[in-house]
Amino acid sequence: MGPIPGAPPGVVDAYVKQSLFPSCFANDLPARKAAVLAATQRPISTVTLGQPSGPPAWAEIPSWALVGTVDRVILPATQRFMAERAGARIVKVKASHLSMISRPGAVTGLIVAADRATR
């Protein structure tokens, strides 16, 4: 984490250390790809993590969730808990936190299935 010039105290940029990125964030990607992603990641402001998001959309509309079973950022049990609480249709995929990169077909399939189910 690093300070943001002109930001209020305690607001910092958050990022994953390049040395840890492959093993925790991209643990199912080839080493070279994980290294490139680590080097090119963009930080997020920690202020975004504390802002209210409003009423949950899943309370009003059907939901789907892809659970990455080898995710080391958001544990699979936590993902399942959130998906079950939302009443989501759950698809489990052997994927890290970056399932959209490591398993794009599974992610696309879930999106297409959700689209077809709601037409």
Which residues make up each language-model segment?
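Helix-rich cap/lid subdomain of alpha/beta-hydrolase
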Residues: 1-54
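Alpha-helical elements of Rossmann-like donor-binding domains used by nucleotide-donor carbohydrate transfer enzymes
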Residues: 20, 36, 78-81, 106-110
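Short glycine/proline-enriched coil/turn segments at helix->beta-strand junctions
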Residues: 42, 60-61, 85-89
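Conserved loop-alpha-helix segment in the C-terminal half of the alpha/beta-hydrolase fold
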Residues: 69-94, 101, 114
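Post-His helix in hydrolase/transferase enzymes
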Residues: 101-117
